[in-house]
Amino acid sequence: MTAAFIGIDWGTTHRRAALIDADGALLDERADDDGALACKGRFRDSLEALVAGWPGATPVLPVIMAGMVGSAIGWQVVPYLEGGTALSDLPRHLQPVADAPAGRRWFIVPGWCLRSEDGDIDVMRGEETQLFGALHLLGPDASDGCYVLPGTHSKWVRLHAGRITELRTYMTGELFALLRQHGTLASAMQSTPASGAAGLHHDSVVDDPDFLRGVAEAARGPVLTHALFGARARVVTGAMAPGAAAAYVSGLLIGAEWADAQRLASRDEPVRVIGESALAALHAACARLHGRRFETLDARQIQLAAWRAMAAEEIHA
């Protein structure tokens, strides 16, 4: 089949590109570490190199990019869409790349900004594309509900009639990585390997009693900074083995996220997670502890559905 367009999830540290044909079928995928930070000042050259070295791709293919590529650290700043915009309208707001060569159709997906009545402001870039993909992959039932998009910055989103009505971001993955690499907990937490996009822990942590203990402790509602120091106190007094600290801290952080954000979902509906299997499993463990229904949606399939739907609609330059 002949390639019709390229979709790129261009994050802070990583980039994943999909080559797709006119029927929406995936022809090939590529992933690398040419994220927004690594590409500073050379985004155009990086994209042209990606296309030039990709069999089946041609320079004139339309390219749709989402994520931090449209942020202040990205290629060009694309203004956020505001909360009242319907997700289904996302393709109508694609922004052309200002310095694209003549004849090239390169576009960046805008991020999302939500301002609450009490003055709280939250934003996202990239996750709006996945939510758009969920609407197209799942159909009308996806227009209402609670979604979790875990990662370095975990997003909890409430949709109503296809519009984002609530958005809460948690620095769960970033905090775990910082605690594991720096400070007084680092030596204990580094005794167990991390994995996953957010580095939260290996798959077996789901069945680890220390992880579940951390989730349960967070459910009690302690001040998180105090609970985190409690991990150090347990290790230095011998109440906790050093190798258990990473699982316990992982449970505290994800558990604190759940303790606050689960209110976005009603008791009679599932919490839907869009993410890789390792992180989804951690969130599923939290859902079980809180007595919540839970559904896992494959992030890769969601992303491909988004690219297909965007390419199928008219692109307004």
Question: Predicted segments — roles?
Answer:
Residues D21-A25, A102, R158-R163:
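Short acidic-glycine loop/turn motifs at beta-strand connectors
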Residues G56-I121:
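Short beta-strand-loop/turn "lid" adjacent to the catalytic site in phosphate-handling enzymes
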Residues A66-V69, P150-H153, V273-S277:
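Glycine-rich beta-strand-to-loop/alpha-helix junction loops that act as flexible
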Residues C113-E217:
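Glycine-rich phosphate-binding loop plus the immediately following alpha-helix
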